[in-house]
From Swiss-Prot:
Protein topology in the membrane: Multi-pass membrane protein
Cellular component GO terms held in the UniProt record: plasma membrane
Assembly and binders: Composed of six subunits; NqrA, NqrB, NqrC, NqrD, NqrE and NqrF.
One term of GO molecular function: oxidoreductase activity, acting on NAD(P)H, quinone or similar compound as acceptor
Catalytic reaction list: a ubiquinone + n Na(+)(in) + NADH + H(+) = a ubiquinol + n Na(+)(out) + NAD(+)
Subcellular location: Cell inner membrane
Protein name: Na(+)-translocating NADH-quinone reductase subunit D
EC number from the UniProt entry: 7.2.1.1
Amino acid sequence: MSSAKEIKKSILAPVLDNNPIALQVLGVCSALAVTTKLETAFVMTLAVMFVTAFSNLFVSLIRHHIPNSVRIIVQMAIIASLVIVVDQILRAYLYDISKQLSVFVGLIITNCIVMGRAEAFAMKSAPIPSFIDGIGNGLGYGFVLITVGFFRELLGSGKLFGMEVLPLVKDGGWYQPNGLMLLAPSAFFLIGFMIWAIRTFKPEQLEAKE
């Protein structure tokens, strides 16, 4: 059983120290597509966290019984099954959000973060640490998504979770929404600023000069 210190490290390290988007530059496509609203970013975070944690758990449980030649296929089958479960739950209980997320829920199957943790960690580790690692990397992914979604929705529409936060000019307020924040390039800019901020705060993440 992992100690409390190891569990804390596994959960918190992917948020800043080894963030899958900011440091490893993985899972960027969905970060651009689902962050126009904080609500969709939050749901996508939960979906990826669920899939990453349980795919790690199941891969770890059967890792000694998977032939090396088909390990990627087995991992993909497990991940795909979990994604189908998530997709069906969203369709049943959060249909409007499911429509907004569109194909990007299905594309979790090909998300490099999920595949990477299954191959690099779960195949070599015990079930509980693998499950915790999945939660941690899901949180790291979600940290970027939720931060980007927060600024895009707030500055792009003056709302958060669909509720008006900044009084809009059209309603007699003072804020004029910035339409650029609702376009995909704004997510690139925000992720770039986040990477800069994290690497300023964590200079050890800077790449060595050639």
